[in-house]
């Protein structure tokens, strides 16, 4: 089926499985619609590898994947490969169709905080190979970004004031997360926001909250102390840091904060349980980079906290935000170009992703901020983009998870049918049809609207609990 032999234990014994970084070709980047920033095309230098980019994640120098060594039988199209040229992801013509082969343990990786390939390959298989409709993970299939500001210390106060004067907060909504204690790097350093005794910051957060921005917790009371020292065994010492931060932020905005980000991405499992017990909806995550809102596995098991969604960061190679650009010897133009590509990507693919930054770094990245504003303005004018906040998307994802739907057919007349239902409402749930494979799409039960978007049809459900749609499949 796959055009090669693999699992050659009798022949290779202990060498049956190899380990290597994974590389995608320029063609694969387009074919699989790999997210900007996930591939590093400069990792392997020039020569035969110049058109192959290494798959990356945040902070790790390399991602090393286990894979079977293979023996070719017939020609295949290699989309991803290992350093020794072993196909990692390939397609093979078989009969009147094609077979997609993934030579990595996708499910195993999902349970260990690296599920990008699993999600991307399943999406590609369903939409591009089987050519079936898919249920969008955004309301009305509207692409967008969660722009997450991490306010770690009092070094952010003047940059925030400058952003406000420049009209930055007139757009959005954004998700602004605050570390509220009096210290930042170490105890008694006086570098924190000291939110309970900081009238300016209190007034600023109240203004942004009233304007529709989402205000949340960034840990942890003392940013670096919590970020460096909290671990699985010291809940009794550090849970009060979460309590104090939560009380301070919630008191300031006049309602309970519902979204969270961990200082330095440090999130012990007890902190996730604390979020669930306090009724939080979402948290920023440095795991599963490249995904939208997802249910992360914890210690190899699915999260037991219903309704709580992880929002992975969007990595740019091995970094995630402005502060790290100079550390990696990069130029501002590199991350500016990445953000422009990311904005275009989410808009075209009807997806939501998170990008975060520290306001304290913004004085050094004014051109990047200008690019974000101008690019967003252009995409909004085209009806292709919107800003999201974490709580809003979490509510949507919980409703989406409640949707039950299936595809029937084709029958003798070549008709296929989607039957969908929800215990509440299907409002804004959207099915995306490849236009070249579906025609005469019509709603036979329930409410909805149909519109064409480039080479796709978007079927947006109305406020009814059930929906049936028929269409003629194009061979």
Set out the residue ranges of the language-model regions.
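Extracellular ligand-binding/catalytic regions of CAZymes and related secreted enzymes
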Residues: 86, 93-149, 153-162, 366-402
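Solvent-exposed beta-hairpin/edge-strand motifs
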Residues: 380, 431-447
């Amino acid at each position: 089926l796959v055009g090669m032999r693999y699992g050659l234990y009798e022949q290779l014994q202990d060498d049956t499985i190899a380990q290597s970084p994974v590389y995608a070709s320029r063609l694969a980047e387009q074919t699989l619609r790999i997210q900007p920033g996930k591939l590093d095309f400069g990792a392997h230098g020039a020569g035969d590898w110049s058109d192959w980019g290494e798959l990356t994640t945040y902070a790790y120098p390399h991602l090393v994947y286990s894979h079977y060594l293979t023996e070719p039988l017939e020609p295949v199209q290699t989309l991803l490969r290992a350093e020794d040229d072993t196909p990692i992801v390939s397609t093979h013509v078989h009969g009147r169709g094609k077979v997609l082969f993934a030579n990595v343990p996708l499910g195993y990786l999902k349970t260990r905080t690296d599920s990008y390939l699993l999600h991307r390959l399943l999406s590609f298989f369903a939409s591009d190979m089987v050519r079936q409709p898919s249920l969008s993970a955004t309301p009305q299939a509207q692409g967008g970004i969660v722009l997450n500001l991490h306010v770690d210390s009092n070094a952010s106060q003047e940059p925030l004031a400058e952003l406000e004067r420049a009209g930055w907060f007139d757009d959005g909504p954004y998700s602004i997360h605050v570390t509220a204690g009096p210290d930042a790097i170490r105890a008694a350093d006086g570098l924190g926001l000291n939110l309970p005794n900081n009238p300016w910051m209190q007034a600023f957060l109240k203004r942004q909250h009233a304007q529709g921005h989402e205000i949340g917790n960034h840990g942890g009371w003392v940013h670096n102390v919590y970020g460096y020292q909290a671990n699985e065994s010291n809940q009794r010492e550090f849970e009060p840091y979460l309590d104090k931060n939560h009380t301070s932020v919630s008191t300031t905005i006049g309602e309970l904060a519902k979204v969270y980000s961990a200082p330095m991405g440090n999130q012990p499992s007890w902190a996730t349980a604390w979020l669930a017990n306090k009724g939080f909806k979402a948290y920023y995550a440095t795991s599963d980079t490249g995904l939208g809102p997802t249910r992360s596995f914890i210690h190899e098991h699915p999260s037991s906290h219903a309704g709580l969604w992880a929002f992975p960061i969007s990595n740019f190679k091995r970094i995630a935000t402005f502060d790290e650009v100079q550390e990696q010897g990069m130029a501002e133009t590199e991350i500016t170009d990445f953000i422009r590509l990311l904005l275009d990507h989410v808009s075209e693919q009807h997806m939501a992703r998170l990008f975060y930054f520290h306001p304290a770094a913004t004085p050094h990245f004014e051109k990047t901020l200008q690019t974000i504003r101008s690019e967003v303005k252009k995409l909004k004018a085209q009806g292709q983009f919107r800003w999201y906040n974490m709580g809003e998307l979490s509510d949507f994802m919980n409703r989406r998870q409640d949707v039950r739907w299936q595809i029937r057919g084709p029958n003798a007349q070549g008709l296929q049918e989607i039957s969908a239902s929800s215990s509440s409402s299907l409002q804004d749930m959207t099915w995306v049809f490849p236009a070249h494979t579906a025609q005469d799409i019509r709603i036979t039960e329930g409410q909805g609207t149909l519109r064409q978007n480039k080479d796709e049809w978007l079927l947006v459900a109305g406020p009814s609990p059930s929906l049936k749609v028929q269409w003629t499949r194009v061979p």
